[in-house]
Amino acid sequence: MTTPESLGNFVAFMDSTDIGQLFVPSSKREMRQLVPDYSQDEDGVDRVKVLMATPNLIVFEAFRPSGETDRMHMHKDHHSVAYQKEGRVRMTIGSETFEVAPGDTYHHPMGVKHRHKSLEDSVRIEVKYYPEGNAIESWNRLAAGSNQSK
């Protein structure tokens, strides 16, 4: 079993008492602004709430206001799968573009460029899979530009 000690004592955007737990009550957690370290054209367009963190996975809920977009980018250390919970977005993955509606799911593999434009206020649940087992360290680096508290 994963223990809080094996994961460290800090996960960006996650309450420290939830680290390594089998059940995390999302309803008592607040969303926080994310300013990714790959951000150049964006101003922290997502508000995120980490729902679960393990050595290989980060699961979070993200809200993006209508009209906001990130620049085309890729991740060298993880794959992502997202479930569109609310709102519509235009998702470009590699050379393909999709209009994603509530209930749709999409995947952007590790190393594949992608961009996400919100056509309406939108909420997605995203799972990031880190095959090397460095999920928490990588997530904390990604969120390094954000104003967050431990």
Regions flagged by a language model, labelled:
Residues 88-90, 97, 113, 123:
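Structural motif
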Residues 94-111:
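Short acidic-glycine-tyrosine-enriched beta hairpin
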Residues 85, 102, 120:
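A cytosolic small-molecule/anion-sensing beta-strand core signal
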Residues 44, 58-76:
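Conserved short histidine dyad/triad with adjacent acidic residue
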Residues 55, 92-96, 119:
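Short strand-coil-strand connectors
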Residues 77-89:
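Glycine- and acidic-residue-biased ligand/ion/polar-headgroup-sensing regions
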Residues 1-56, 71, 141-150:
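A short, N-terminal "cap"/entry segment at the start of jelly-roll beta-barrel domains
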